[in-house]
């Protein structure tokens, strides 16, 4: 960072100067501020910062042709044509590139942009399969107002970067400038206009864009994002070191090539719901472009090769909600209820006609409200795809990185579980798998795990709603061989860049084996990607490449799509009576598909209904006959059984044969489908099973018809011919045996038989025509509640505390007799009710009721919840279906034909609303017991007290006070560690006595800073080498060597100075300023100004009792004496004219060679004459006085002040 002008002439304050010394300069200046707040949000990384470490630059992209030549500065779709016309540029031929042959060549776009010193040539093609034909964007207002406009996706593009076709991916929109993702193998870029709404100004000098880059070693977007209730993982900083090799291997083995469209494509038609918080953040004028760009990225994620299936995410409808509706759907802090509200809302938006353009398979809801705990990004049911209510997800929108959240939650709905939770794919979590419990995927590093692929393949075939294609099949015919349109020179340019062409430096035996390319600047340096040229590439006059060989092309080897042949005649009927089916088939042989051609689309069979006449045995049950056939052939549990028909509860299993044992009641699958023409359900007399699938048939006998019978069996009737019959019979047991009560005629429907009072008797029913009992024979009474099939209909029998009930929807195919098996002499009373067509009534039947509503009726069930908890709301009556006989609530389907009463409205909760307040939960245990990363979290919610002593969560904006903190640091003490000593350094001298040093660090098991309780090992020691050689160069001169060894001394202790290494001198001229010496305790400043700080500490700490600051015991310690004393051999030469003097407080001594005197550190020393002469008696070094004076006035003042404090301390 350059200093501001005049900085040398002004005095900087110490704090500012310290920042100038310690802070590194920024990589680039920030972009200019936007014009308004809306632009400010757009200028930041999409949806907020991309995370710490994201770099940004300004760039001006331009539109080019396929060769990278400038076409226009206009990049927006709205003005691109005008820009080209303004320049009157000649038409430029823009051929399509490999992998993008879905559209006309003229629809491709090419852009050049320079990002961080790299010139990128973007090759784009329209993403024509993101927005379905007829898709709309709907604005739902506060008072039920709705505004609908067409949803256009004409400015959405996907593609790659030239030269990196297999290792790059681009998803951009050019609605208003370029916005979206540019992904390459090792890094990713986001690009968006610096300011929006300036497309009209592009033609003059281009348009400034912001480009963000995330390096491959940085954490993923926004850090790990919690999904569902996933547990936190290790930090990415530690993972980057441990997974470096694995990521390199994974990146090299996993290709991100864009998939070609396959015949087994699945299309998820999406309703995208957006609440008001998202609209307000992005702005009404920009939200549509943002949503299309976001979903374009989601679509690219589902096109990744690792998924193992080709799934298209197709937008059919976008709904933007008002503020009031948004607040009613999202319940703060309650993700389960919020998801239920969103799914219910999406279900209500569904179009009733499945053929409608806006009919959706799946709903995605985006919000910026905090619907769950802190960090929760999404919520979704598992395996809910195609379900009318459960196929929905709730997602927290937070910029383009939310694309991974949407993909993750939609993966749950498709049946995928979290990686590492219940499966064995935990090893793929750290590599950036989409279904990780925490979002760790990034645009340069993401994939679907092997478990996700397996779980998807397990369920995908059952999602029938994904099989239809919302797009019209009017695409242009694809070339039979792609190489027919590209020469080898063009393919070399696609592979290696501009200028490259086919290598001619050597002749290969067959040029179709591998494509070799070279540049004219170095024609003898040929390169290849070890792949052959495209099939159809011309390789010799009249010859073309095909499957790696240069051959003559003949019609029999070209790609050929299949086509259906003629239908065969209809075969025989599957049944002789009771309605069967007959089939006809066709073959895909006109012609057969060949050489990779498409197979025929559609079903290979067709069927018709046949043999519709009733069977002679009116009581025959076709499903029962199929089960009965196994009585003699199928043993279960080493025993034979009498098999009865059973209807499976799952509608998808009803065309598979399940039978129930009469002896044990056990239900067994016969592992086969029912015969064609079997009724799907006993509740539907017309729909039939055809090849394992239930085909809807109306009562009019038309396949696919929705026409139904009324309550008494009239097809399309209005119940006008229906009559209700009821009665009550009371009998007293007079003898043993059955007591006959009454008969119910054939044709009766909606039959209900019930005891008036609970008794010990047993109800029995007999088929009058066959004489066989269908319920409770005298010697075989089963009083347990059950559902069974008899006489071709399903019966429900219940015994509730001795009160028996029997009912069936009918119709009865024969008359039944109702009897009672008496137990005791208690009177028994039975009531019965049923509906029957008036033509089937007996003339003398006096129990006919004229009204149709005698069996069931609508009754008040409860009041709906109040629309407001306070401040005056409203609630409405909710009705349920009630049986008149006993006033029990039953399924509302029984009252479907009755007119429902109009709801009644009333006021509720008129009391005034209380002021919401912040409510905090208990702090959770600290995430760490020691170290520097411990954190505690707690829940913080805005709660509004209600009048009934309950509370509810509301939006944070309703609380006036400052939001309490939800995270805080904890347990930040250093962890226990152990001393680790390094190797000893070389001796400080080459001869004589010196010192050695070594680093001693306190480290924990994971090699982080720690605190050690044990005594620290020594960091310095003496070393003794051989005696130094004498000076024989000038015998007339005499030299003396004073050997001085440092050793701890209580009077002159050694001081510790913490640093990361030996001081190499000051690194800034500002270090000499005494006013900055107060910052020497800061490690960063001490390292920067180590020399000045050492001098300052030596002068101000005479006794050397400075202790290292708390928590800093992990640095390398360098031992230095408190006052400058010699640590190496010091040579003293006597002057010829003056007596020899030693300036170290020399005095007389009695030391001799035999009795050496000890010096200031109790180390024996000797004074050696270099020529064995007698040493001067006054050459004895003494301990220097700590009170010596200095010429520096300021330093002397500090020394005097310290001396005074020391003297006062002694007194």
Swiss-Prot record:
Q: Which Pfam families match?
A: ADAMTS_CR_2 (PF17771), ADAMTS_CR_3 (PF19236), ADAMTS_spacer1 (PF05986), Pep_M12B_propep (PF01562), Reprolysin (PF01421), TSP1_ADAMTS (PF19030), TSP_1 (PF00090)
Q: What EC number(s) does the entry state?
A: 3.4.24.14
GO biological process terms held by the UniProt record: collagen catabolic process; collagen fibril organization; extracellular matrix organization; lung development; protein processing; proteolysis; skin development; spermatogenesis
Q: Where does Zn(2+) bind?
A: 408, 412, 418
Q: Locate the motif Cell attachment site.
A: 691-693
Q: Name one GO molecular function term.
A: metallopeptidase activity
Removed propeptide positions: 30-253
Cofactor or coenzyme needed: Zn(2+)
Q: What is its main location?
A: secreted
Positions of region (Disordered) = 1170-1191
Active site positions, chain numbering = 409
UniProtKB keywords: Collagen degradation, Disulfide bond, Ehlers-Danlos syndrome, Extracellular matrix, Glycoprotein, Hydrolase, Metal-binding, Metalloprotease, Protease, Repeat, Secreted, Signal, Zinc, Zymogen
Q: Which cysteines are joined by disulfide bonds?
A: 343-392, 386-465, 425-451, 492-517, 503-526, 512-545, 539-550, 573-610, 577-615, 588-600, 987-1023, 991-1028, 1002-1012
Briefly state the protein's biological role: Cleaves the propeptides of type I and II collagen prior to fibril assembly. Does not act on type III collagen. Cleaves lysyl oxidase LOX at a site downstream of its propeptide cleavage site to produce a short LOX form with reduced collagen-binding activity.
* Assembly behavior: May belong to a multimeric complex. Binds specifically to collagen type XIV.
This one is known as A disintegrin and metalloproteinase with thrombospondin motifs 2
Origin organism of this chain?
Homo sapiens
């Amino acid at each position: 960072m350059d200093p501001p002008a005049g900085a040398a002439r002004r005095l900087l304050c110490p704090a500012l100067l310290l920042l100038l010394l310690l802070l590194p300069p920024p990589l680039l200046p920030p972009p200019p501020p936007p014009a308004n707040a809306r632009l400010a949000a757009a200028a930041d990384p999409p949806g907020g910062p991309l995370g710490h470490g994201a770099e940004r630059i300004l760039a001006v992209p331009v539109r080019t042709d396929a060769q990278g030549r400038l076409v226009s500065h206009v990049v927006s779709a709205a003005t691109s044509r005008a820009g080209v016309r303004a320049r009157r540029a000649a038409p430029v031929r823009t051929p399509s590139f490999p992998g993008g042959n879905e559209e006309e060549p003229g629809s491709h776009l090419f852009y050049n942009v320079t990002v961080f010193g790299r010139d990128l040539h973007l090759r784009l093609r329209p993403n024509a399969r993101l927005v379905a034909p007829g898709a709309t964007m709907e604005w739902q207002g506060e008072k039920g107002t709705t505004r609908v406009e067409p949803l256009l996706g004409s400015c959405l593009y996907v593609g790659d970067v030239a030269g990196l076709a297999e290792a790059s991916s681009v998803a951009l929109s050019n609605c208003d400038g370029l916005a979206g993702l540019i992904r390459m193998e090792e890094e990713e870029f986001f690009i968006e206009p610096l300011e929006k709404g300036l497309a009209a100004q592009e033609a003059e000098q281009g348009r400034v864009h912001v480009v963000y880059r995330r390096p491959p070693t940085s954490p993923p977007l926004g850090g790990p994002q919690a999904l569902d209730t996933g547990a936190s993982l290790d930090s990415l900083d530690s993972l980057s070191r441990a997974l470096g090799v694995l990521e390199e291997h994974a990146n090299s083995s996993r290709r991100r090539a864009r998939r070609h469209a396959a015949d087994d494509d699945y299309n998820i038609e999406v309703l995208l719901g957006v609440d008001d918080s998202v609209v307000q953040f992005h702005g009404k004028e920009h939200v549509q472009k943002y949503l299309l760009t976001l979903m374009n990225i989601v679509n690219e994620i589902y096109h990744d090769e690792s998924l193992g299936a080709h799934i298209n995410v197709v937008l059919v409808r976008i709904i933007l909600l008002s503020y009031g509706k948004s607040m009613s759907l999202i319940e703060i802090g309650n993700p389960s209820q919020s998801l239920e509200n969103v799914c219910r809302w999406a279900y209500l938006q569904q179009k009733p006609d499945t053929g409608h353009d806006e009919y959706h398979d799946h709903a995605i809801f985006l919000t910026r409200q905090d619907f769950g705990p802190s960090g929760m990004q999404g919520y979704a049911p598992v395996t809910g795809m195609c379900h009318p209510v459960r196929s929905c997800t709730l997602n927290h929108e937070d910029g383009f990185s939310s694309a991974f959240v949407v993909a993750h939650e939609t993966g749950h709905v498709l049946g995928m579980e979290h990686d590492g939770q219940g499966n064995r794919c935990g090893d793929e979590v750290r590599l950036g798998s989409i279904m990780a419990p925490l979002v760790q995927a990034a645009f340069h590093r993401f994939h679907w795990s092997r478990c996700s692929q397996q779980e998807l393949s397990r369920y995908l075939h059952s999602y029938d709603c994904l099989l239809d294609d919302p797009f019209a099949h009017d695409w242009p015919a694809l070339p039979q061989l792609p190489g027919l349109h590209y020469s080898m020179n063009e393919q070399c340019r696609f592979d290696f860049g501009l200028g490259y062409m086919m290598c001619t430096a050597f002749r290969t035996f067959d040029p179709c084996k591998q494509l070799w390319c070279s540049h004219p600047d170095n024609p003898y340096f040929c390169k290849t990607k070890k792949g052959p040229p495209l099939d159809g590439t011309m390789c010799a006059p009249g010859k073309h490449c095909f499957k790696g060989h240069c051959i003559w092309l003949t019609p029999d080897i070209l790609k050929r799509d299949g086509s259906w042949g003629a239908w065969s005649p209809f075969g025989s009927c599957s049944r002789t009576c009771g309605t069967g089916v007959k089939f006809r088939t066709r073959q895909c042989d006109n012609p057969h598909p060949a050489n990779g051609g498409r197979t025929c689309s559609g079903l290979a069979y067709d069927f018709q209904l046949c043999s519709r006449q009733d069977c002679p045995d009116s009581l025959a049950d076709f499903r029962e006959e199929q089960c009965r056939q196994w009585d003699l052939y199928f043993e279960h549990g080493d025993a034979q059984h009498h098999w009865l028909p059973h209807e499976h509860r799952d509608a998808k299993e009803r065309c598979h044969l399940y039978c129930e044992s009469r002896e044990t009641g056990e239900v067994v699958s016969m592992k086969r489908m029912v015969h064609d023409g079997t009724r799907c359900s006993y509740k539907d007399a017309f729909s039939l099973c055809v090849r394992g699938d239930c085909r809807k048939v109306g009562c009019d006998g038309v396949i696919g018809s929705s026409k139904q019978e009324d309550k008494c069996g009239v097809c399309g009737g209005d119940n006008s011919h229906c009559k209700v019959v009821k009665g009550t019979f009371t009998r007293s047991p007079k003898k043993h045996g059955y007591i006959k009560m009454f008969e119910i005629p054939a044709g009766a429907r909606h039959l209900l038989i019930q005891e008036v009072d609970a008794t010990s008797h047993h109800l029995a029913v007999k088929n009058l025509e066959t004489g066989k009992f269908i319920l409770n024979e005298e010697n075989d009474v089963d009083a347990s509640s059950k559902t069974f099939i008899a006489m071709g209909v399903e019966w429900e029998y219940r015994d509730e505390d001795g009160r028996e009930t029997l009912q069936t929807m009918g119709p009865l195919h024969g008359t039944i007799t109702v009897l009672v098996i008496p137990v005791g002499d208690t009177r028994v009373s039975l009531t019965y009710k049923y509906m029957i067509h008036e033509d089937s009534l007996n003339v003398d039947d006096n129990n006919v009721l004229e009204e149709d509503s005698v069996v069931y009726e609508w009754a008040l069930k409860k009041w709906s919840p109040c629309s407001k908890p306070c401040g005056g709301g409203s609630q409405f009556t909710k009705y349920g279906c009630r049986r008149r006989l006993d006033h029990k609530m039953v399924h509302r389907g029984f009252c479907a034909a009755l007119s429902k009463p109009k709801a009644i409205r009333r006021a509720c909760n008129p009391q005034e609303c209380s002021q919401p307040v912040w409510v905090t939960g208990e702090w959770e245990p600290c995430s760490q017991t020691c170290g520097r990363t411990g954190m505690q979290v707690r829940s913080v919610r805005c709660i509004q007290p209600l009048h009934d002593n309950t509370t509810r969560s509301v939006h944070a904006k309703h609380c006036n006070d400052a939001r309490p903190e939800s995270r805080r640091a904890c347990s930040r003490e250093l962890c226990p560690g152990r001393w680790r000593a390094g190797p000893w350094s070389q001796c400080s001298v080459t001869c004589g006595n010196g010192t050695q040093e070594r680093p001693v660090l306190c480290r924990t098991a994971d090699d982080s800073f720690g605190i050690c309780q044990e005594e620290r090992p020594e960091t310095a020691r003496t070393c003794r080498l051989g005696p130094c050689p004498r000076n024989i160069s000038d015998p007339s001169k005499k030299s003396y060597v004073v050997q001085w060894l440092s050793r701890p001394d209580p009077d002159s202790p050694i001081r510790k100075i913490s640093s990361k290494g030996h001081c190499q001198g000051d690194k800034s001229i500002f270090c000499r300023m005494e006013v900055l010496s107060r910052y020497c305790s800061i490690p960063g400043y001490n390292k920067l100004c180590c020399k000045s700080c050492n001098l300052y500490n030596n002068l101000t700490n005479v006794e050397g009792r400075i202790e290292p600051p708390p928590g800093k015991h992990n640095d390398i310690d360098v031992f230095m004496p408190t006052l400058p004393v010699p640590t190496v051999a010091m040579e003293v030469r006597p002057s010829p004219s003056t007596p020899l003097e030693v300036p170290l407080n020399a005095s007389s001594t009695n030391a001799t060679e035999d009795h050496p005197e000890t010096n200031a550190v109790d180390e024996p020393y000797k004074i050696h004459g270099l020529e064995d002469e007698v040493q001067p008696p006054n050459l004895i070094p003494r301990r220097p006085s700590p009170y010596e004076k200095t010429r520096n006035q300021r330093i002397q003042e500090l020394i005097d002040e310290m001396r005074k404090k020391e003297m006062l301390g002694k007194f």
